[in-house]
Amino acid sequence: MTDKRKDGSGKLLYCSFCGKSQHEVRKLIAGPSVYICDECVDLCNDIIREEIKEVAPHRERSALPTPHEIRHHLDDYVIGQEPAKKVLAVAVYNHYKRLRNGDTSNGVELGKSNILLIGPTGSGKTLLAETLARLLDVPFTMADATTLTEAGYVGEDVENIIQKLLQKCDYDVQKAQRGIVYIDEIDKISRKSDNPSITRDVSGEGVQQALLKLIEGTVAAVPPQGGRKHPQQEFLQVDTSKILFICGGAFAGLDKVISHRVETGSGIGFGATVKAKSEKANEGELLSQVEPEDLIKFGLIPEFIGRLPVVATLNELSEDALIQILKEPKNALTKQYQALFNLEGVDLEFRDEALIAIAKKAMIRKTGARGLRSIVEAALLDTMYDLPSMEDVEKVVIDEAVISGQTKPLLIYGKPEAQQASGE
């Protein structure tokens, strides 16, 4: 590097790019028979920065998966629920397309489309939201609506949701503003009755009111690094209009509200259309006919429903669907336990009748896919406890009798003569 000095021959040095002498610039950087001044270095940096800004949006746009690609990715992890996947794929694609192209297109302001998922426990609502966030590589956080209260009351403030999202991305505001928030048990904050009450409902309608602005879009002031709020503190400003909110709930009893509306429309008394019990719609079919007026009768306020324009309904999982969930997805439960046993150098086999028994047990418990893990865990608990202390075990076999609790898993040892059933 040369700094305002002549070379060994006493010759004056010049920048090879702009032609300025060493006396006209602060620094000259020497290369093989060439020199560049600090001003030209700054200019090069500016040019590169501008090019990066121009190229970045195009890269982002090309990186956004299409609705078909989103649906295909969901298929790898979530069994069934095809209508819900389609609705989610379109809604998520449109949301991130709006972010990547600005909030306006040709002067038309693009509205925000948050999502409401309605379906029974264990039908895949949370898994769908998590899978979407993983595909899009955006921060994701979950909140339980039952713990939320209005500001000033004992409980969790709604702005804590944004704080959790910031924690997921090390308080990077730009990343957080592209994240996904899933609010579970949203049906539990329904109004206690159809008519507005003069008494304060801090965990029901009050929470809906508090969530309105957050979901629609506001600038939330969040204390940095999870500190408590106080007047002298500088807050992080997070624009929630760019955050995708997905609300989910079981909405137990909503099918009866819909059924009443549908059946009332078909007439009553002598002019009514009489339907046999077998002809009446099941819960899944009824939920797919949900209208805003049904949600209002259930206890959600009209303003809150208006902030969740995209509604997707999920059906209760059938026995066949539960069997598929056990073995087909990329992170299927049986594959997870097989990987766990492989770490001990042991193979794990689930017989087909065992999978059927697990699914039947989950159907009886009415826990959906969520209950599958606890059933498998209970069946394998003793084996997982003993296995690390045992030698020469090559394989563990799970059949129907193991799931029903009649026998323990079959342990197959390396030496044929040592083959025996555990616990015999």
Swiss-Prot record:
SUPFAM superfamilies xrefs: Glucocorticoid receptor-like (DNA-binding domain), P-loop containing nucleoside triphosphate hydrolases
Entries under InterPro entries matching the protein: AAA+_ATPase, ATP-dep_Clp_protease_ClpX, ATPase_AAA_core, Clp_ATPase_C, Clp_protease_ATP-bd_su_ClpX, ClpX_bact, P-loop_NTPase, Znf_CppX_C4
Annotated residues for binding of Zn(2+): 15, 18, 37, 40
GO molecular function, one term: unfolded protein binding
UniProt: ATP binding residues: 120-127
Any coiled-coil regions, as ranges: none
ClpX-type ZB domain sequence ranges: 2-56
One Pfam family per UniProt: ClpB_D2-small
Family per record: Belongs to the ClpX chaperone family.
Record-linked NCBIfam families: clpX, PRK05342.1
Free-text function comment from the UniProt entry: ATP-dependent specificity component of the Clp protease. It directs the protease to specific substrates. Can perform chaperone functions in the absence of ClpP.
Subunit field text: Component of the ClpX-ClpP complex. Forms a hexameric ring that, in the presence of ATP, binds to fourteen ClpP subunits assembled into a disk-like structure with a central cavity, resembling the structure of eukaryotic proteasomes.
Protein name: ATP-dependent Clp protease ATP-binding subunit ClpX
Protein species of origin: Enterobacter sp. (strain 638)
